[in-house]
Curated annotation (Swiss-Prot):
Dual-specificity methyltransferase that catalyzes the formation of 5-methyluridine at position 54 (m5U54) in all tRNAs, and that of position 341 (m5U341) in tmRNA (transfer-mRNA). This is tRNA/tmRNA (uracil-C(5))-methyltransferase. It comes from Shewanella baltica (strain OS155 / ATCC BAA-1091). The gene is trmA. Its EC number is 2.1.1.-, 2.1.1.35. The lineage of its organism: Bacteria, Pseudomonadati, Pseudomonadota, Gammaproteobacteria, Alteromonadales. The keyword RNA-binding does not apply. It comes from the Bacteria. S-adenosyl-L-methionine binds at residues 189, 217, 222, 238, 298. It is an enzyme of class 2 (transferase). Keywords: Methyltransferase, S-adenosyl-L-methionine, Transferase, tRNA processing.
Amino acid sequence: MNLAAMDPQTYDTQLEHKRIKLEQAFAQFETPSVEVFASEPANYRMRAEFRMWHDGDDLYYYMFDKVLNEKVRCDQYLPASVLINQMMSALIAELKPNPSLRHKLFQVDFLSTLSGEILVSLLYHRQLDDQWRADATALKAKLSSQFNVNIIGRARKQKIDLDKDFVVESLQVNDKTFLYKQIENSFTQPNAKVSVKMLEWAIDATQNSQGDLLELYCGNGNFSIALAQNFNRVLATELAKPSVDAAQYNIEVNGIENLQIIRMSAEDFSDAMAKKRSFRRLEGIDLDSYVCNTIFVDPPRAGIDPDTLALVQGYERILYISCNPETLKDNLQQLNETHKVTRFALFDQFPYTDHMETGVLLERR
């Protein structure tokens, strides 16, 4: 975190520097002009994590400033959603005078939504007992007069859900509303409004598509659910069980009937497609019946492994969302041999940082 860089008045300048840096870094691939999708300059993060500092009777949130090399008190936090900032104030007022709730509390995580739900996770360096549960239940009841809130307590090998451990986000994407179950302690897009722009860009990039779509690393179905409208069928893979469970919920609640989720890694799926190995999880699924002309990938920061990259290269069109320009550039060295970049986008998920989220559409040469 660099608090000094978080100045909304300099946001446009910082974003322009990112655009220039990105265009220069990828100039060798003769990309089209970068499509730039800006963030809100403040209150854009839907989740935030704070450490807790105990100072006598005082108790406050803090973060570590890497530039100043010191902890910084955070009574409010400019990047966090308005809902998180409101909850920060209300929550700390209740925690301070309560011995049970504050005892050995070392971290608080917030997960909020545009739909108005918020999840608060309290993390402790002690085991949670009946007194904690009673006080946390009373806390939830009091906060519920102002917020649509759920509370989770965590300690070593212990997790207490007072109600549920997820929120349901509602995103307006073009003329459609999509609902997404987001589970505590699982990956979700941090900047909801930029996430909407990413979905709309991906939908536009795949308009008038032929055949089916294959998606690797689908998470909770964020993209595959929105993109299903552009394809006959969608086949998606994800390894993390909580994400797969959330994806199945999201498929049902959004009424998507042409999307199949398989729980397996991209590497294993590559082996299955190459018929190197058979997998019980694929029983009843006829991979050969899918006519996938388009593949969508949103890999982790490490990028795409060599075997999967070879698989990806076999498709006419590749839609690649990247959270790491360095590994995207490395992957493009190979993909550029057979495909040409026809669209290139910068999504500013993380203002005031060096982080750049990018989107690339590649089409066979």
